[in-house]
Amino acid sequence: MENTVTQCGLDVALAVVGGKWKPLILYHVRGGPTRFSEVKRRVGGISEKVLVQQLREMVAMNVLVRRDHNRVPPVVDYALTPFGETLVEALVPLCTWGNRNRAEVTEMLQREGGQEV
């Protein structure tokens, strides 16, 4: 039997927000209820299929709430839950770090493989 020891809370946080898209989605819904089409436009580069999957996962994890306004045409928006708000608060320092180090990271990534930030 394998004994798994949690080294820190980072593995727990990454289980909720891990991956390329979830932190960006959270960043773009932090200002209040946001319609699906607006999330897709703000995030940029994400397919509709992947966005639907990521939103469903975050709703299932109680990070976001999905609200269907039962109108025609359909109006659905997503908002942070109180639990999700605490997660966004935890991501703010990471965002600050990224802004502060953008030039250096961009230079390193371009030097290594031509990737842009």
Per-region residue spans from a language model:
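Loop-helix junctions at membrane interfaces
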Residues: 2, 80, 116-117
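Short, contiguous, well-ordered secondary-structure segments
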Residues: 3-4, 13, 62-63, 90
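N-terminal helix-turn-helix DNA-binding core of bacterial DNA-binding proteins
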Residues: 4-50, 71, 77, 85, ...
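Amphipathic alpha-helical dimerization/coiled-coil segments
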Residues: 27, 86-117
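Short amphipathic alpha-helical/adjacent loop interface patches that line ligand
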Residues: 33, 43, 55, 84, ...
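Basic amphipathic alpha-helical segments that dock to polyanions
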Residues: 51, 55-58
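Beta-hairpin "wing" of winged helix-turn-helix
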Residues: 59-79
